[in-house]
Amino acid sequence: MLSILMQGLRLKKCFLPILVMFFLAGCVNLLGSSFTASLKNDANASSDFYIRKIEQTQNQQDLQTYKLLAARVLVTENKIPQAEAYLAELIDLNDEQKLDKSLIEAHISAIKGKNETAEYQLSLIHLTLLSPSQKSRYYEIVSRIAENRHDNISAIKARIQMDNFLSDIQRKQQNNDRTWALLRNTDSEVLNNTDAEGNITLSGWLTLAQLYNDNLNQPAQLIQTLLTWKNYYPTHTAAHLLPTELQGLANFQQTTLTQVGLILPLSGNTRLIGETIKNGFDDAKVNYNVQVHVFDSMKMSIEQIINQAKKQGINTLVGPLLKQNVDVIVNNPYLVQDLNVLALNSTPNARAIEHLCYYGLSPEDEAESAASKMWNDTVRIPLVLVPQNNLGRRTAAAFTLRWQQLLGTDANIKFYNQTADINFALKSGLSESTDGVYIIANNKQLAEIKAVLDNINPTLKLYASSRSNSPNSGPEHRLFLNNLQFSDIPFFKDRESEQYKKIEKMTNNDYSLMHLYAMGYDAWLLINQFNEFRQIPGFTIDGLTGKLSAGPNCNVERDMTWFQYQNGSIYPLNEQDDSII
């Protein structure tokens, strides 16, 4: 009997480890490995890291987890096709992996603008099953769907929900920055009419945006207002992590000018250009007691001018105008160290340099404005007709970039070398679905192009740049261009003003010189508020060449004014009570 019992005990000892092993294996199949649980956490490595792990891992379940992590990060890196490829390889997923895969798929749908699909995918996910990290991703997708629908307030509300589940400081900062960007891109009237409905965090964000907008052009008051806001909302997420865009305001100092160096070509073939810009600059500063030292860049090298300016104690420069001189500064930024510089041109080499901004009358501004205007006018399949030269290529690139931002697709671009090419370019570029055409051409070419378009499709919406605006356009010509819209500087809105009549006489009604005068005028407006312009996000200046704001690399961006030919006259759009011609 004893021997039988002993044998039984020995059998139990033998089988117990085997039973435990099978039990644990069953748990792994049901719940996933301990590594699978990492899907519930943030993915902090790069996609390259997870891809290397995929190549190194032998365990099938861990391999699936690494593919999910790689796909998740690839989505955040905007590498959607690669992410989808990894998702397509997944097989035999456990419940935790299926749950995470569902989140990634919903995120991809939202990024692609498939809002209904993304919403349906989210509806299949039970929030109670998600970890805090996964819940933050869930609400990020909700926010993206709202953004796709241009519903910024709903996107902001989702971001607030998202913040509740973020523990990483960097992610919290990124979320605050995105929330602030949404607020800044929301119409002030919408912000003012939004009810926080007792949500203290939303109330704090709305108040912050309203105070910022109300005090944007009063920097000293703006800084004090932000401090007051912090005291009123001490526990707000933005009080702890102020949006990055606002953090620089703490060191803001108002612009004070005593001496300014103006660098222009004032002799040789470019003398007229330089003198016209100088006239505009001088007229703008006439009521300011600031000493201006003028340097002729045709007589001295840019290096000599900068050294001379430093010796004279000048710490603010306007210019140079010539591109080769701008490139000298871009390639040797130490030359302008400790100086404020407003270059009057930009080049393909332009880059971010401390205390340097680039200002010029670039075709890119008009092209971007045209893309936005056509989008707002419900044009969705535009044709862009441009000359086969530097102007045309720059215009086409800028329009396409803006169109990609608006619609996610490329614009249809057609180039022409000479007027004879235009007919072929139009017929080959137009399709039945084309609903608008943006044209870069001179005044005479524009009339020829419109004649062709009227024969092909007279219902097309037509847009042009300032290049086509000419003082030689008589009533008959203007009548022929009926309904065509074009962009130009706001200086042309009021042709009855004393300033306009003065400049019209000074330039002998030469539109190109009038543009240069307006540029010189605005150069003073910019340098006189240079710190405000550079350091206060959203700060704008209403100039003669447009509404001026600081873009990437401190490139001065211009919001253009749009005009329309109507019944033989030209009207600023939305101001049709006052004909300007």
UniProtKB/Swiss-Prot annotation:
Gene Ontology molecular function: enzyme regulator activity
Gene3D superfamilies: 1.25.40.650, 3.40.50.2300, Tetratricopeptide repeat domain (1.25.40.10)
Biological process annotations from GO: peptidoglycan biosynthetic process; regulation of cell shape
Membrane-protein topology: Lipid-anchor
Lipidation (S-diacylglycerol cysteine): 27
Taxonomic superkingdom: Bacteria
Chief location bin: membrane
Lipidated residue numbers (N-palmitoyl cysteine): 27
Membrane listed as a keyword: yes
Leader sequence segment: 1-26
UniProt entry keywords in alphabetical sequence: Cell outer membrane, Cell shape, Lipoprotein, Membrane, Palmitate, Peptidoglycan synthesis, Signal
A Pfam family annotated for this UniProt entry: LppC
One GO CC term on file: periplasmic side of cell outer membrane
Cellular localization per UniProt: Cell outer membrane
Family stated for the protein in its record: Belongs to the LpoA family.
UniProt subunit comment: Interacts with PBP1a.
Main function: Regulator of peptidoglycan synthesis that is essential for the function of penicillin-binding protein 1A (PBP1a).
This protein's name: Penicillin-binding protein activator LpoA
Organism: Histophilus somni (strain 129Pt)
